[in-house]
């Protein structure tokens, strides 16, 4: 087996600064490595000056060798699960993209998934303080969730966010991005990132084959960029705007709390005008199917069909207590939609031990701290959870 990410990919999407081959890699085994040899440890952004040469470090070489022998490394369990169930994993999608376009340039950084910082105006229920400053500001909620082992980043501070932000800019400034083929910029919310415009200018200067380069911005849809930013974005011929939208109207406001649905709906319609004018190559959703919304997917697909935005769906396996795979398959199958991608996710035989008591506790705590009531916006899902404890 081969994975482009282990040879030329980097994902930097949490405030600990872990340098993973892709965002799906579960690098706990690297983080727990106690060997003194620095080449054996998971590198972080705070340990380096540049991304150049990163894939020659021991953890990456070991991943490359394991895959070449036909074995999925421990950190690649999510792709292993998806491929076993017949889904097109991140590994397969990226390999196909690079093979179709003959995009490989050995020894270079070609695939990036980064958060320039974690400034965010939302507190999504499946997120955590390591990826959202809004979450990081909710100290009491984080303490309560930690009592139930529900938060992976327990004590984020403004100082840590700022340290990451400046170190990220320093490392990117020292990195050769001339052969970049794909970048996904997320957050936080990218349009709030302090260095977003600076980074767009760097990409515009350095990428030597812009026609072979895809720029993807992952946004929660709450921000429509100012003209100077928009003009710079529209210079890239392969611009993709991806909306992290898992529901509509009141359920959307509950799951991804912080901004009213009317604002998000209006912004997406503005982006659609640029798509219709040929200025944006794709508008697409990344909708996470979780135990919070699995029964409401038909209304979501209808909405996006009506406004003319492509849909993409992602199964959630972590955190376990928000996964649909805690529910029996026959329960999930009652909510099939006729959409193959959604239905394949609903019917997948993925084994996750039920923790529905924790699911209810998580819902209760988030309700309390966001002044929302999940039961009022998805009573059916809450009842299903209770019936299957």
PLM features: what roles do these ranges have?
Residues 1-158, 176-177, 349-389:
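N-terminal pre-core extensions flanking Radical SAM catalytic domains
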């Amino acid at each position: 087996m081969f994975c482009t990410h282990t040879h030329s990919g980097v994902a930097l999407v949490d405030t600990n600064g872990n340098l993973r081959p892709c965002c799906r890699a579960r690098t706990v085994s690297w983080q727990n490595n106690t060997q003194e040899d620095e080449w054996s440890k998971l590198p972080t952004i705070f340990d380096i000056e540049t991304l150049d040469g990163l894939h020659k470090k021991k953890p990456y070489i070991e991943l490359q060798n394991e895959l070449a022998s036909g074995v999925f490394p421990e950190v690649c369990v999510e792709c292993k699960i998806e491929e076993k169930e017949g889904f097109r994993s991140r590994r397969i999608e990226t390999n196909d993209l690079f093979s179709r376009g003959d995009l490989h340039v050995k020894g270079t950084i070609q695939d990036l998934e980064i958060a320039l910082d974690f400034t965010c105006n939302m507190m999504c229920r499946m997120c955590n303080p390591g990826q959202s400053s809004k979450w990081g500001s909710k100290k009491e909620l984080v303490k309560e969730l930690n009592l139930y082992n529900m938060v992976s980043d327990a004590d984020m501070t403004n100082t840590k966010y700022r340290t990451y932000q400046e170190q990220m800019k320093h490392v990117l400034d020292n990195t050769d991005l001339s052969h970049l083929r794909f970048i996904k910029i997320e957050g936080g919310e990218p349009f709030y990132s302090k260095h977003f415009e600076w980074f767009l200018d760097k990409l515009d200067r350095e990428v030597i084959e812009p026609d072979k380069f895809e720029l993807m911005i992952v946004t929660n849809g709450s921000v429509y960029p100012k003209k100077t930013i928009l003009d710079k974005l529209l210079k890239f011929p392969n611009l993709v705007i991806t909306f992290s939208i898992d529901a509509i109207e009141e359920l959307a406001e509950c799951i991804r709390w912080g901004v009213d649905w009317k604002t998000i709906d209006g912004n997406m319609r503005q982006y659609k005008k640029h798509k219709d004018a040929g200025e944006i190559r794709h508008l697409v959703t990344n909708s996470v199917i979780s135990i919070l919304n699995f029964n409401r997917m038909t209304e979501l697909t209808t909405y996006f069909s009506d406004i003319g935005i492509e849909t993409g769906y992602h199964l959630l396996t972590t955190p376990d207590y928000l996964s649909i795979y805690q529910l029996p398959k026959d329960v999930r199958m009652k909510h099939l939609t006729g959409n193959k991608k959604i239905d394949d996710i609903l019917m997948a035989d993925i084994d996750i031990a039920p923790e529905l008591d924790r699911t209810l506790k998580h819902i209760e705590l988030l309700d309390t701290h966001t002044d929302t009531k999940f039961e009022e916006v998805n009573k059916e899902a809450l009842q299903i959870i209770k019936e299957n404890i």
